[in-house]
């Protein structure tokens, strides 16, 4: 086998000092490439609930999950069976992994059957929210979501999906509780769960100016999400989760203090006179 090559960060000066706390080892054959290949543990193909699907690596973020000064990778696995919010149909299960840069799998979160898979649904944030030097993960969850240690959020027996193939709601989740959960970066253990703000109702209240278009009653507009991290008080980070891309947009800001998610404020453009009403956008920018 080819010997590994170790690379270190050094400080320039009269007496260079090697920073032995941060290093990266590459195979000799890889040292000339301008990137680091990180092996992933791809989930097995699934045949369940009448669905067959495989997984592919999707959105990713980085954060120092264990406080050692090095980044870890947090990766969303996208099933091949996904849907956009307006379309009926069942989806596969949405998974989120955490890896070290050498490919060690730290944990896997399974969001469960009550979180639909698709680009518009799961927005996850990775950031050190409480200032302890370790990043947390925050995302929307539901009954049956399972954390990185095997703990189940909510009621594991509940299946809130519409299972009638003839219904315009087929495969959609327009009933049941919705949650916002924060997970420990080192283990993937859920630290706190709160009721998601806002809820999805009324289903026909998200299109048109002020959400009064009454042009969608099947969750196509109610189930579109964005999210970001913002220093709202200029000192500590908050998370902002947004629901609605069209007529009505609701932004909910949360702080994570002493192990608890705490609502900071909620902005709602549901009034037609609101200048932010009807300002359709599929993205969130924070500056």
Stretch-by-stretch model annotation:
Residues 2-6, 11-287:
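Beta-propeller-forming repeat regions
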